[in-house]
Amino acid sequence: MKVINGLRQQGVPAALFAALLFGAGTPLAKWLLDSVSPWLLAGLLYLGSGVGLTIYRLISRAEPCRLARTEMLWFIGAIISGGVIAPVLLMFGLTHAPASGASLLLNAEGVFTALLAWFAFKENFDRRIALGMVAIVAGAILLSWPGEAEFSDVWASLAILGACLAWGIENNL
């Protein structure tokens, strides 16, 4: 009963849909990279997000939000890290890595986000967070153990992990 009530909350279906789109994004991007440059695809993905959110804000008649001047540098850092560096690194990594391996490596974003929050921003860190990070890493290792996911190109893997780190920085800014 709690699960059904949880699904009725406004943000839960949106979060599930976002997770679905994120999960489908890597194989779709890998497929598109056969005919589009990594730079162009990275730009188009984020342009599409911006256009979609702009349309949503116009339709919902959302109040404009004002950013304090003191927050502007943090905002610019988040845009550069998560909106420029991360997608470009991901697309370049995907050009030389299989989608299955990239999908497993993308789990590192949550780990990087938590570690940066803990070390750089002095956020609380407890046993549950540590266990969650261990579960993420262990799950990626277990899923790749039979040799199904290939990590043959070290530079591609490092580019994807760099994208995860950049998104972790964005999440914390």
Regions found by a protein language model. Give the residues of each.
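Glycine-/small-residue-enriched transmembrane alpha-helix faces in small-molecule transporters
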Residues: 1-45, 49, 149-173
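Specific transmembrane alpha-helical segments of multi-pass solute transporters/efflux pumps
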Residues: 21-26, 54, 60-100, 105-106, ...
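Residue-level recognition of pore/gate-forming positions within transmembrane alpha-helices
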Residues: 19, 46-50, 110-111, 133-136, ...
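Helix-coil boundary and interhelical linker segments in multi-pass alpha-helical membrane proteins
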Residues: 35, 92-98, 145-152
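Hydrophobic transmembrane alpha-helices of multi-pass small-molecule transport proteins
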Residues: 53, 116, 125-146, 164-167
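Specific alpha-helical transmembrane segments that line the substrate/conduction pathway
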Residues: 40-51, 90-124, 163
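Cytoplasmic-side transmembrane-helix entry/capping segments in multi-pass membrane proteins
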Residues: 11-16, 68-78, 125-137, 156-157
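C-terminal ends of transmembrane helices
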Residues: 53-64, 112-125, 169-173
